[in-house]
Amino acid sequence: MEEKYNPSAVEEKWQGYWAEHESFKATEDPTRKKYYLLEMFPYPSGKIHMGHVRNYSIGDVIARFKRMQGYNVLHPMGWDAFGMPAENAAIQHKSHPAKWTYENIAYMRGQLKTLGLSYDWDRELATCDLDYYKWEQRIFLEMYKKGLAYKKSSAVNWCPKCETVLANEQVEDGCCWRCDSPVRQKELEQWSFRITNYAQELLDDTYKLTGWPERVLTMQRNWIGRSTGCEIDFPLENGLGKIKVFTTRQDTLFGATFMSLAAEHPMALDLAGDAQRAQVEAFIDKVKKTDRIKRGAEDLEKEGVFTGSYCVNPVTNTKMPIYLANFVLMDYGTGAVMAVPTHDQRDFEFAKKYNLPLKVVIQPEGETLDPAAMTEAYTAEGIMANSGRFDGMGNGDAKEAIADFLEKEGIGKKTVNFRLRDWGISRQRYWGNPIPVINCDLCGVVAVPEADLPVVLPMDAEFTGEGGNPLARVDSFTTCTCPQCGEAARRETDTMDTFVQSSWYFLRYCSPKFSAGPLDREKVEAWMPVDQYIGGIEHAVLHLLYARFFTKVLRDLGYCNVDEPFSNLLTQGMVIKDGAKMSKSKGNVVDPNALIERYGADTARLFSLFAAPPEKDLDWSDQGVDGSYRFLNRVWRLVYDVLPVIGEAGAVNPDSLGAEAKKLRRAVHKTIKKVSEDVEERFHFNTAIAAVMELVNAIQAFAAKDAPENVAVVREAVESVVRLLAPFVPHFAEELWSQLGHDTVLEAAGWPGYDAAAVVDEEVTVVIQVNGKLRSKLTVAPDAKEEEVRAQALADDKIKPYLEGKDVKKVVYVPGKLVSIVVA
């Protein structure tokens, strides 16, 4: 064994061994319990960063731990490879997106391999591979046939810099999630997936996801946003139609004094009178330039315009002016709001600004509100007033009674509404999966016949940076023949949102080379669901919701029998340096390559796992990295020093051990127990590593003598340290295991179990309190009888002075911990 630890030599040796022996290749085996471990796959941006190192190290610990426990582990890796950065790079470097992407993949794959991550590289996939995206096109066509994919004209979020559509979930504080540019509203024909068909199931099944963080589940439930209420028809005053409203507050219907419509409402221009048309058109144009997020904000200044038209409150028969309002969205309900200014704050602010009438219909119990004196809306519970037959009822009871009344009178109906909107997937970019449809002037939208799939991205697109979709400028791609009528037609040039590819990759990993369809159902059933998924919380209502939706769709299409894709979810924190997330713009990036070159991959892994619990942000510390490296050197030196002594040591005989040897053995087995629980039950890798560090201190402090039983204890202790470190620092641990004389790898050795008898303390310390104050301590056997402990406590020399001349009222014993004496 070399005297000094040489990380590069050790890591090169064991990475070569794992590759040669295909150590992490997963095959279906019904005789073994499966464990599917997955981290969210990366975008091949060029280089991995410390966030990747941390994320993938967390996953690798779990994968290696489960292998040592005997599980059949699937741990794959791939690339979320379509997307806009590749096009931008093509423009900047005058290189094709495919070339840039595949070069990045090759480089990043090499980086991941240097970290010693236990991936089954045989299952590697890239979403830009034809063998991947062709099956996605087939899935799209099956969804189209089922009515789950459709095209329609609608107002969309448009990023002028990226020149593409964004889903609602991709707009953050009014800006594009990628480039941070302000988002505008634009009317476009676009393809969407009918995720709303699954809204109720997506909501219901969140309550089955007991292995997910409650924060993520709450975010999804709020995004889906189920509301129970009524749809109510408000006739137009001219008798030429009606406005349909969805409300959850039918108890306030008698107080509705005006109507607010979204600027995008289909009736908005039709309702404009001649005198108001110019104002209405100007207002609509202004609102369409404001993003949805700002329009929904509570602090938005309320603005509107009178259309010149009126509708009629169906229960009071009073005339209600119809306004367009900037805070009303087409995304929710019907895009029309019955305005009740006395009981809704936004309506109140709007009514005050435009001098609209106020009518109180819910009074606080025992009080009377005066509309003229109100300074804000009354939104609490109360007693119905000015509401006809419902006066005097509590407004909660009135909700149900009014809903029944509306249905009986044919004015409205009870209904459920969701905040969730259908998922717009059209993107005006080249580097994405082509949508497999043809646009024909005679036949309309025509699906590409399955026999003609895949629709392949042309390689001769030009990337000029002049804007627009490069795909639309490739005549050889766009010009085609209609498969129905045989006339000239034009191929769809929109490509699919990259979140489509990441919505099913975890299923494809189960059979990545399957050539008869998207999924091999038998293999999917062998591996799914993913037992542990790891990724950032920023994906809570994007990728994680879409993946759940897609899994349910593929189930209903007959490809799998899985309801939910991910049984357990761990959302890891960020890597922070100098008080901010690492980024090039902030100049606080740490290059993993430089770190590995100096210290080795195992040190990089150890620091990223030891510095903080996985779910918390990790504060970068150069001293912490040095400390991790010193610890590994200390363990290496420990093995080097004791190896000549313990080489021939036999098994431990617990009955022949002296007090110090027993103490060390107890520390060993307590550490095994703690590390096992910290890794398996809590993912508290930091405390697990800290426990191993303490054990190393205990071994070094133990003076090994020539007595055979002492040598055996030291060998057991050292081997336990190596086995416990194996998931965290795998190259290092394998090398030490080999040097200790083992001809099998650590996975074959298995995870160590602890001796239950060895972890029991021979003595425990019991504190003695008198009237709640600590006065002394006792050392007793763990199984000492209560009477004995009480007697010792009362006879303790330090306790006697507090009992003299006092009456002992009560003595309480908490086994192994406390004797509480109460005196008066």
From Swiss-Prot:
Q: Motif 'KMSKS' region, which positions?
A: 581-585
Keywords of the record: Aminoacyl-tRNA synthetase, ATP-binding, Cytoplasm, Ligase, Nucleotide-binding, Protein biosynthesis
Classification via Pfam families: Anticodon_1, tRNA-synt_1, tRNA-synt_1_2, tRNA-synt_1g
What CDD domains would the database entry show?
Answer: Anticodon_Ia_Leu_BEm (cd07958), LeuRS_core (cd00812)
Q: Where does this protein reside within or beyond the cell?
A: Cytoplasm
Query: What EC number is given for this enzyme?
Result: 6.1.1.4
Residues that bind ATP: 584
Cellular component GO terms held in the UniProt record? cytosol
The record lists its disulfide bonds as none
SUPFAM superfamilies xrefs: Anticodon-binding domain of a subclass of class I aminoacyl-tRNA synthetases, Nucleotidylyl transferase, ValRS/IleRS/LeuRS editing domain
A GO BP entry is: leucyl-tRNA aminoacylation
Q: Which domain of life is it from?
A: Bacteria
Motif, 'HIGH' region: chain positions: 42-52
Instruction: Give the reactions, separated by semicolons, that this protein catalyses.
Output: tRNA(Leu) + L-leucine + ATP = L-leucyl-tRNA(Leu) + AMP + diphosphate
Q: Name one GO molecular function term.
A: leucine-tRNA ligase activity
Family the entry assigns: Belongs to the class-I aminoacyl-tRNA synthetase family.
PANTHER family from the xrefs?
Answer: LEUCINE--TRNA LIGASE, MITOCHONDRIAL, LEUCYL-TRNA SYNTHETASE
What name has this protein been given in UniProt?
Answer: Leucine--tRNA ligase
Q: Which organism is it from?
A: Geobacter sp. (strain M21)
Q: What lineage is on file?
A: Bacteria, Pseudomonadati, Thermodesulfobacteriota, Desulfuromonadia, Geobacterales
Q: Which gene encodes it?
A: leuS
